[in-house]
Structures are given as structure tokens and as C-alpha cells.
Amino acid sequence: MAAIDMFNSNTDPFQEELMKALQPYTTNTDSSSPTYSNTVFGFNQTTSLGLNQLTPYQIHQIQNQLNQRRNIISPNLAPKPVPMKNMTAQKLYRGVRQRHWGKWVAEIRLPKNRTRLWLGTFDTAEEAAMAYDLAAYKLRGEFARLNFPQFRHEDGYYGGGSCFNPLHSSVDAKLQEICQSLRKTEDIDLPCSETELFPPKTEYQESEYGFLRSDENSFSDESHVESSSPESGITTFLDFSDSGFDEIGSFGLEKFPSVEIDWDAISKLSES
């Protein structure tokens, strides 16, 4: 019983729990302690009831009971869980995406061939967004959709007068070359000139014979066609000088003589 006295002399509460757990196994033990047959996992084992004669299964069972009691008695001794910080969603910008190592990249789609132009790698998303805005304004002008439209009307900010230029010099030179090529293609693709889009107006003057067209270009075009046609020689033999075109111009009609029968003249001829 020396082992039992040692546990009783200790004031640790867990040791008292251990003694309570060992009570079924520490019955009256003496020099002639009886033996009994114990079946563990289907095997017959003959063991003594002394404290120093516990089987491994009994020791494991006692440890489980002690762990359960410790969790019930002292729950505050366990470390408190630390809540994770709520990760706020990063604001997304047009033409900007993040690499898995944390850097931000910017790229823009060209208007003609729909390919992407690499604008560079940046430390912050805002800097990458500014690089995209600068490239978009150079390519599309006032029609560009920007991440920061409030800077559009600031003097020199997107026009190149600002000292802040997030684009690399090589990227900026490539962008300028693309802009020049786009301007050339736009000049070539013009469908027609301004004179063809807006033809000269024709004016009409009112007269007693109706409305007369006073388009100078029409007269010049008609005279040019007559002179250039192979049948223009025929018109030279026609003489309209004696006709009645003097009063009403080239658009008048000559008066024909009356076709009524003059009976007075016929009667005079018959009398004579």
C-alpha cells in the first residue's frame, strides 16, 4: 500500500482523480492476492489485482478517463480560437489582373486586330489602372473607357503633359507607333471626299413659264458633254438665232401660226 500512501500525500487534484479511477483495481491486496480470469479482446488473461499488475489495456482505459475529466473540469485552459480577419474583396480595374505572387499587370486590347498589348508589371493595382487609362486615352481619345474618368478633363494629365507616366519607355514608344499606324489606316479608309458627301445645292428661279434651274455646274457639264461627244458636229449645223428664244431664253417655246380658216380672205379671193 506504499503506492496508495504516496498518492494520498500529494495534493494534486488530478492525482485524486487517478485514485478514483484506480479504485476498481486496488481492492484488498495482500501477499496471497487472488487471481481471476479476464477476457480482453477474446484472449483469456490471468492477472493479479495489485496496483503494479495492470494490463496495457487497463492503463489505456484509465488514461482516456483522465483526459475526459480534465476536459470537463478545466475547459478554460484550452487555447481560445483566434478568428481570421475578414478579407475584403480587392477592387477590380479595367485591364488589370493580379499575379499569384502579388504583383499587378496591365494590358490593353488594340482596336483593329484585337490583340493584347502588354503594358507592364506594377506594385499596386492603382498604378496598373493608371497605365491602362493612359494607353486607352492614346488609342481611343475621348471615347476611351477609363478607370479614373475624373482625371480626363485635367490639363495635360492624359495628354502627355503630366510628369507621371507609369508606362516604360519601350512600351510608350510601341504605343506611339501603333497610334501612328492607326491614323494612317483611318485616312486610307475614308469612303469619299467631302464634296461627294455634300453636293452643291441647285437653285430654282420662278418665272412665268415655271421654275427654271440655275445650277452653274449643270450648264458647264452639258456643254462639256456636247463638245466631247462624237455627234457634236451635228449641232453646229442647227441655227436657232431666228427663233423665239430671245425673249424667254433657251427654255421657252416658239409660237406656232394659227390653224383656223380665214373665211374673209377666201371670200375676197373668190370675188376677185
UniProtKB/Swiss-Prot annotation:
GO molecular function per UniProt: DNA-binding transcription factor activity; transcription cis-regulatory region binding
An annotated GO cellular component: nucleus
Subcellular location: Nucleus
Keyword Transcription regulation among UniProt keywords: yes
Keyword Ubl conjugation among record annotations: no
SMART domains, A to Z: AP2
Coiled-coil ranges from the UniProt annotation: none
One Pfam family hit: AP2
GO biological process: ethylene-activated signaling pathway
Major localisation: nucleus
InterPro entries: AP2/ERF_dom (IPR001471), AP2/ERF_dom_sf (IPR036955), DNA-bd_dom_sf (IPR016177), ERF/AP2-like (IPR051758)
Position of the signal peptide: none
Keywords noted in UniProt: Activator, DNA-binding, Ethylene signaling pathway, Nucleus, Transcription, Transcription regulation
Chain residues forming the annotated DNA-binding region: 92-149
Function: Probably acts as a transcriptional activator. Binds to the GCC-box pathogenesis-related promoter element. May be involved in the regulation of gene expression by stress factors and by components of stress signal transduction pathways.
Family: Belongs to the AP2/ERF transcription factor family. ERF subfamily.
Protein name, as recorded: Ethylene-responsive transcription factor ERF060
Biological source species: Arabidopsis thaliana
